[in-house]
Amino acid sequence: MTGTAKVSIPKAQPHKVPCVYLAGDLVFRPNAIELFDELKEICKDAGVQGVAPFDGQEGVEEMAPGAETSLKIAELDRKLMDRCDGGIFCLDPFRRAPDMDPGTAVELGYMAAQGKPLAGFTTDGRMYPEKVRSYRKQAWGDALKPRFTKGGSGSMEDADGLIVHSEGFLQNVMTEGFIRMSGGFVAVDFSIQEAFRTAIKDLAARLNSQH
């Protein structure tokens, strides 16, 4: 007796759309909701799902400002980062200072420690030492000066004798450097949407190649 064996063809598994945490001082800006909506559309076009910090903060708007509310937000944001496959970070200077938003820097380090792919974007293409130089002049009326010792991460120091570090980087090397070590880069454009578009396109390609 002969016959044809039935071949079981496995069903194709649905493609999982990678989730990307959208981090930055954008949450503090007057048009935050509208801006995140724009960035989410750009994410969709790139083939990923953008997740804003607000997406995990249901009910927070009903809580009174204070330490308890702030800590709750930090807890909820951490849960969102744990769920996401990668992160994209705004490295714009914060509150007219040379450095980026410190909370965003913490989030960047947190996701870097998880080994997740990262990307960055900014509208300010000046190198970090130049940002420090401009800030010191405008805020304190002083200037940078050359260091007498060689080596380290900077050849200049400020009026307080602190090294102006991270030469060759847009921000502190511990932030931009972690992005580079994950395989990404920081995109620069005068338009925040275009800078984001360039960065998310690269991050999406890396994330989708893993799925």
From Swiss-Prot:
UniProt cross-references to PANTHER family, sorted A to Z: 2'-DEOXYNUCLEOSIDE 5'-PHOSPHATE N-HYDROLASE 1 (PTHR15364:SF0)
Principal cellular location given in the protein's record: cytoplasm
GO cellular component terms, A-Z: cytosol; nucleus
MF-aspect GO terms: 5-hydroxymethyl-dUMP N-hydrolase activity; nucleoside deoxyribosyltransferase activity
Gene Ontology biological-process entries: deoxyribonucleoside monophosphate catabolic process
Localisation: Cytoplasm; Nucleus
Family statement: Belongs to the nucleoside deoxyribosyltransferase family.
One Pfam family per UniProt: Nuc_deoxyrib_tr
SUPFAM superfamilies, sorted: N-(deoxy)ribosyltransferase-like
Keywords annotated in UniProt: Cytoplasm, Nucleus
Superkingdom in the source lineage: Eukaryota
Protein name, UniProt field: Uncharacterized protein C191.05c
